[in-house]
Amino acid sequence: VIASDNCKIMFIDCIRLNTMCQKTCENHKKIIYNLLGVVSEKNIALNEKIEFLSKRTTREKLLSYLYSCALKSGSRTFTIPFDRQELADFLCVERSAMSAVISRLREENIIKSDKNRFTIVGG
């Protein structure tokens, strides 16, 4: 795990967390609810990443990711949370190969891109 910002790690005693306290306090319920939400979001993100990485080519991985971002944003134009190197790392591809694919997709008028802002034009 690599953090992009400074962070703190919190270790949670799962046994204590799974055992409700005597009073069944609201704070305990809220912690469990919030933790379940975080775990659920992480599970969804990991399943999406598996979907991207299961593609065979850099082009397929990239297009799968970009279409997913467009769907999530509800728009053909969207901004991704990565620079080119971070995106290449996320998709487990070489940055130079990915940049070449982006250039070809632009030439084929499938996407428009400016840094981390993309528009799905066709496809």
Which residues make up each language-model segment?
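Long cytosolic regulatory regions associated with cyclic-nucleotide signaling
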Residues: 35-42, 56, 101
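Short helix-to-loop capping/linker segments positioned immediately adjacent to catalytic or ligand/cofactor-binding
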Residues: 19-26, 45-54, 72-75
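A general alpha-helix detector
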Residues: 16, 45, 83-86
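Short acidic/polar alpha-helix capping motifs at helix-coil junctions
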Residues: 12, 49-52, 64-65
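Mid-sequence acidic-hydrophobic segments that form the walls
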Residues: 20, 38, 42-45, 65, ...
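Cyclic-nucleotide recognition modules
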Residues: 1-36, 40
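Phosphate-/nucleic-acid-contacting segments
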Residues: 56-61, 65-123
